[in-house]
């Protein structure tokens, strides 16, 4: 078993209209390795002018976590299979909508990996599909959520 953590910091910074919802949603995420990420609510979900559009929002981070976990397993399974991955780029997306329980959630995430291979042995499409299947089955993050994850290579 492993334990992971993050420190989330927010400051009202003197916002006088706090009771009316007019305060900044900008905050930061700090991680044990020293990384600090500028974060905010999505501008789509809060009053205009209260989000930091340059910050990562929780919905984006959720999609990135699923995508990153899948990629890491995929690359390792490819390596174990004798394949050489040169680059892996995924322009993943997610859909925020009301789910079957009538609660708003990221209900679907679509991964769109583009992979460049090198080396003497290149995987066939069925082998690539199997690598994606195994990566998805073993991804800790995908196994932790009820979101439907689709892979469109």
Q: Which residue stretches match the model-derived regions?
A:
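Extended beta-strand/beta-hairpin segments
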Residues: 1-64, 73-153
């Amino acid at each position: 078993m492993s334990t992971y953590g993050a420190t989330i910091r927010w400051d009202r910074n003197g916002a006088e209209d706090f009771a009316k919802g007019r305060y900044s949603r900008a905050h930061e995420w700090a991680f044990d390795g020293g990384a600090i990420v500028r974060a905010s609510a999505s501008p789509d979900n809060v009053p205009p002018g209260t989000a930091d559009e340059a910050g990562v929002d929780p919905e984006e981070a959720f999609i990135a976590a699923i995508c990153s976990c899948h990629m890491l397993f995929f690359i390792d399974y490819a390596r174990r299979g004798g394949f050489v991955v040169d680059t892996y780029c995924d322009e993943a997306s997610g859909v925020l909508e009301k789910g079957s329980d009538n609660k708003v959630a990221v209900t679907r995430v679509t991964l769109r990996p583009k992979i460049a291979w090198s080396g003497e042995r290149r995987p066939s499409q069925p082998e690539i599909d199997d690598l994606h299947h195994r990566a998805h089955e073993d991804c800790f993050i995908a196994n932790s959520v009820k979101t439907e994850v689709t892979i469109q290579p």
